């Protein structure tokens, strides 16, 4: 598995090395020892406690979601189809605070992301159907959820396809400015993100 640092501080891009032959493809999608060795902290990967999977049709946007109290780390991959996956750094002490980065994740190269605590996450399905798998290090608790509007002009995320469906909760999400106020921080306008 190849593990690389993303542009956003502390985010890792994990690319498995699949074995392909006439039968198809076989790959290892998770290795706790490799992830811990790269992070330099034993036991991080063993702390993942729940797996989730979503299915979305083309154009659906989910997010931007985070945790308000106890932040969570995530492993995210696309198990079917292709998604445009976006992260926003909401850690006030981070050198990339307020920045976002986008990644194309698909079921061909099996690339996935390690997202440390302190990020908003969202994605858009760009294939006809897309299944996204999440592994988290904290049990889900809807009382801890926070959200920022996927189309917040201060973040300026350029979703690659027309947005077809957004949940009522995501449509009602607050702004980047609302989040800054809730976090009791002041910051310059977020820097524009980029695609990896």
Where in this protein do the model-derived segments appear?
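Non-catalytic, conserved peripheral segments adjacent to functional cores
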Residues: 1-108, 129, 136-196
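Conserved metal-binding segment of the jelly-roll/cupin
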Residues: 105-128
